[in-house]
């Protein structure tokens, strides 16, 4: 039917464990084995909700945030540590801005500043990076760029790069860490899948106890 738009899809992959909640959000099926393994590890000591969403891009992210918020209400998640994987990071970062009470901590894995940025957006971001902080260009793009709002992200945020991250994504994570007031950065790049997923889960569980009002900066570690 002409003009018909399919509602954005949010799928609960798993909901395991009990206690304090972790919510893992991703869109790329290539990460499915990793997030399943992380969810299983976290569920041994906390509640782990793994959610897959439709592809996040400059147009879809607004509807997906609304759909994710509705899903969290149905799941009775009132506060959680959120994990945004690749473009899924856009959704949890927006939640931290629009509904900060629900976000205890943020873990951002292999994410660029925008979801799936086009070549034009990459050029635009390079220009914006040279402007005074907080003055992004306004060229009609509806895409979410977390750099413009990083100074408002007050919850503790752990930035993680894995072996899957491209050099571009690694640079983007570093750039976010430089402007976000409460950010750490770690690398987990083991080729052993079990070591990698276990290390990620351990980081997430430990990071949940970070004081919410205790700004820190860029602790560099690697696994």
Protein language model annotation of sequence segments:
Residues 153, 159-161:
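Short beta-strand/loop motif that positions the catalytic acidic residue
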Residues 6, 10-58:
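Conserved HGGG/HGGXW glycine-rich cap/lid loop of the alpha/beta-hydrolase fold
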Residues 166-172:
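Conserved alpha/beta-hydrolase "acid-adjacent" motif
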Residues 183-223:
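Catalytic active-site module of serine/aspartate enzymes centered on a nucleophile-bearing elbow/loop
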Residues 2, 120-148:
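Hydrophobic, aromatic-rich cap/lid helix
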């Amino acid at each position: 039917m002409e003009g018909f738009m399919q509602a954005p899809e949010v799928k609960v992959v798993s909901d395991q464990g009990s206690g304090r909640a972790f919510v893992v959000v991703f869109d790329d099926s290539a990460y499915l084995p990793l997030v399943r393994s992380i969810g299983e590890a976290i569920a041994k000591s906390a509640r782990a909700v793994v959610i897959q969403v439709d592809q996040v891009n400059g147009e879809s992210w607004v509807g997906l945030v609304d759909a994710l918020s509705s899903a969290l209400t149905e799941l009775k998640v009132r506060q959680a540590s959120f994990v945004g994987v690749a473009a899924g990071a856009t959704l949890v970062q927006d939640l931290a801005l629009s509904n900060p009470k629900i976000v205890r901590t943020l873990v951002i894995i292999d994410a660029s500043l925008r979801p799936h940025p086009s070549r034009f957006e990459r050029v635009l971001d390079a220009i914006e990076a040279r402007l005074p902080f907080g003055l992004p260009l306004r060229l009609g793009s509806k895409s979410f760029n977390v750099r413009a709002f990083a100074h408002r992200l007050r919850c503790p945020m752990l930035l993680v790069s894995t072996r899957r991250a491209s050099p571009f994504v690694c640079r983007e994570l570093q750039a976010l860490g430089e402007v976000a007031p409460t950010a750490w950065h770690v690398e987990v790049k083991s080729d052993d899948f079990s070591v990698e997923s276990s290390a990620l889960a351990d980081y997430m569980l430990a990071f949940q106890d970070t004081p919410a009002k205790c700004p820190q900066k860029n602790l560099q570690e690697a696994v």
